[in-house]
Design a protein with these regions (language model features):
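C-terminal functional extensions of proteins
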Residues: 207-238
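Conserved anion-binding
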Residues: 9-10, 14, 20-22, 27, ...
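Conserved N-terminal beta1-alpha1 strand-loop-helix module at the mouth
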Residues: 1-71, 80-81
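N-terminal active-site wall of soluble small-molecule enzyme domains
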Residues: 47-104, 173-178
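Short, acidic/polar
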Residues: 32-47, 95-101, 152, 198-199
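A C-terminal functional module that forms or caps the active site or interfaces directly
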Residues: 171-215, 219
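Acidic (Asp/Glu)-rich catalytic clusters
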Residues: 44-50, 74-81, 120-124, 180-183, ...
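Structural preference for beta-strand elements that scaffold enzyme active sites
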Residues: 1-5, 52-55, 85-87, 107-109, ...
Length: 238
């Protein structure tokens, strides 16, 4: 299973798209937000027939203020309408902001460190605890020892015990192996992880994890199809 990750950087968007909205609205948050809306809507349309889910990085939209929030809500609704499972990567301590309110995503990433309070969600919603993040300074805290395991693994155990799925940003198979060993029944959302390094996350039937690919957001439909084929080939080797 492969998810489209939308975490767009303004300077990587098609310059023609950016220029069109800048000409229309003038430079500023509105032009950038509308460029992100167009970019996201086109990709969701391409991905919907091929992929099961989309992950939207909240901060990339909220940089545009209230217009960015409107775009985020609009893209979530658009993706759901086209049959995609929607996850907002917010790393929040208040999941209901993204699973209820005006956004109504199917799932949301949360920070695990406030404790089990962040695992509370409606029955039809999912919470993904961001136990391993990919920012450069993450190991300063997440790799500290807590008893016989690193802190992020201790957090993973606790979050899984309270019913949360787990999110990890890692390109290392050892991290995935350790995470799966500590939380054998948890569903894993793996970002920035290729299919080969993610193999330990899957069971013998190719289930138990979802990979998120942020390179597809700058690719065309052919690239999405190629990524799906490659992952299917890897997983069926199990």
């Amino acid at each position: 299973p492969l998810a489209l990750v939308l975490s767009p950087e303004a300077d990587k968007l098609n310059p023609k798209i950016t220029k069109n909205f800048t000409d229309l609205y003038g430079p500023g948050d509105m032009a950038e937000a509308e460029a992100l809306r167009y970019h996201g809507s086109q990709l969701i349309g391409q991905a919907a027939p091929l992929l099961p889910a989309v992950v939207l990085r909240a901060e990339r939209y909220l940089r545009c203020g209230f217009m960015g929030m409107d775009v985020l809500a609009n893209l979530v609704n658009m993706a759901k309408t086209q049959g995609l499972y929607t996850i907002v990567d917010a790393r929040t301590s208040a999941p209901e902001v993204y699973t209820a309110g005006g956004i109504h995503a199917d799932g949301v990433t949360v920070t695990p460190y406030p404790g089990s309070d962040v695992c509370r969600a409606a029955e039809d919603k999912s919470v993904f605890a961001a136990v391993r993040t990919g920012n450069p300074s993450a190991p300063e805290i997440q790799s500290l020892m807590s008893g016989d395991r690193r802190l992020y693994l201790a957090a993973a155990e606790q979050m899984a015990r309270h019913g949360a799925a787990l999110m990890a940003e890692t390109g290392y198979s050892l991290d995935v192996k350790e995470l799966r060993a500590r939380a054998p029944r948890a569903f894993l959302l793996l970002l920035s992880c290729d299919g080969e390094n993610a193999l330990p996350a899957f069971d013998d039937y190719g289930r138990g994890a979802l990979l998120g690919d942020d390179t597809l957001q700058y690719a065309d439909a052919d690239a999405i199809q190629a990524a799906v084929r490659q992952l299917k080939q890897l997983v069926t080797v199990l």
